[in-house]
Amino acid sequence: MYAIVKTGGKQYKVAEGDLVKVEKIEGEPGSSVALTPVLLVDGATVKSKAADLEKVSVSAEIVEQGKGPKIDILKYKNKTGYKRRLGHRQPVTTLKITGIK
């Protein structure tokens, strides 16, 4: 059984026991969160209607809070000697899917 959930502006296909890295969700490691909205559930039959999906919940446990890979940014303007180098690491949360009900 799997579900498609939306969090942090992205959609993820999850099944029970999966580890998923998503955009930062507030909470301490070990705490549980509910992932909403659920967009689709596939068990014995596929459910995609809003009335059916209101009854479905996907629960997850926060495994760790961390940072994603570093992205290097280089700004450059020719003929002026202007150079600027920046870096960015997006905060991410690792979740373990504990149940789809």
UniProtKB/Swiss-Prot annotation:
InterPro entries to which the protein is assigned, alphabetical: bL21-like, bL21-like_sf, Ribosomal_bL21, Ribosomal_bL21_CS
Its BP terms in the Gene Ontology are: translation
**Record keywords:** Ribonucleoprotein, Ribosomal protein, RNA-binding, rRNA-binding
A GO term, aspect molecular function: structural constituent of ribosome
- Entry's Gene Ontology cellular component terms: cytoplasm; ribonucleoprotein complex; ribosome
Give the superkingdom in one word.
Bacteria
Pfam families per the UniProt record, alphabetical: Ribosomal_L21p
Subunit structure of this entry? Part of the 50S ribosomal subunit. Contacts protein L20.
The job of this chain, per UniProt, is described as: This protein binds to 23S rRNA in the presence of protein L20.
Q: Its family? A: Belongs to the bacterial ribosomal protein bL21 family.
- NCBIfam families per record: L21
Name recorded for this polypeptide: Large ribosomal subunit protein bL21
